[in-house]
Amino acid sequence: MNTETGTISFGGALPFLDGVSFIDEFYPKFQVPISVVNDGKAAALSELWLGNLKGIENGLALVLGTGIGGGLILDGKLYQGKHFQAGELSFMMKQSDKVSFDDMYGRTGSAVGFVKKVNQELGTEDLTDGAAAFEAINQKDPIVYPIFEAYAREIAYMICNIQAILDLEKIVIGGGISAQAIVTEEIRTQYRAIRAGLPFVADTLTEVEIDSCRFLNDANLLGALYQLLLNVDEELVVNG
């Protein structure tokens, strides 16, 4: 998603948005400033502005949803990359005998997919019922809690790999399931367990701080506002 032109290069689950410029579509009609930013980058912006990445030079907002969104803060600013594709963590690949999206982090780290697995085990009629899933998880249900631990471990491995490349100060967890405090707690627990099992890694690489987004699932909305303010008057917003 090009934040300069407002063009969506790939609409994902909404393919009718491929190649659409929101600025070209809406500005002639409404004649007001328009900004476009994806969810992961928006979450990072809001947390940098007023949240749990405020004052951080190098950090990451990791958004758990249908896939995994990411917003990188490098040198105190949102890093988007040459093609505005930095932080597209769903497309990180895992070793596999076959080339398949099933073996990419966007599938194995999907919060939606994880909730469905839990509800399948519980026999819940609505497989997308997050409340039912987390009621069982918070009660440490012996059948579904291992599924939750495995999911948190999957995210923790991703964090280990990201940290080996970027040496971040802090990572904040967002997305709908971040409203459940146990999510960030278990990811942190699994991350530390991985490091404990690999002493040479723990001795070499500094442990990154893992926290929840201050604004949880609303971080995306606030970050979109911040992007708009930056577009209108960056100097005023940054320098107050």
Where do the PLM segments sit?
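ATP-binding/phosphotransfer module of carbohydrate and carboxylate kinases, centering on a glycine-rich
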Residues: 2-5, 24, 28-32, 49-56, ...
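Generic detector of well-ordered alpha-helical packing
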Residues: 3, 39-40, 48, 89
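Short glycine-enriched, charge-decorated loop/helix-capping segments at active-site entrances
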Residues: 8-15
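Charged helix-capping and loop-helix junction motifs
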Residues: 15-19, 153
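General beta-strand structural signal in soluble alpha/beta enzymes
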Residues: 34-38
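Active-site glycine-centered loops adjacent to acidic/histidine catalytic or metal-binding residues
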Residues: 39, 65, 224
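Acidic/histidine-rich catalytic cores of soluble enzymes
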Residues: 44
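Glycine-rich phosphate-binding loop of actin/hexokinase-like ATP-binding domains
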Residues: 54-108
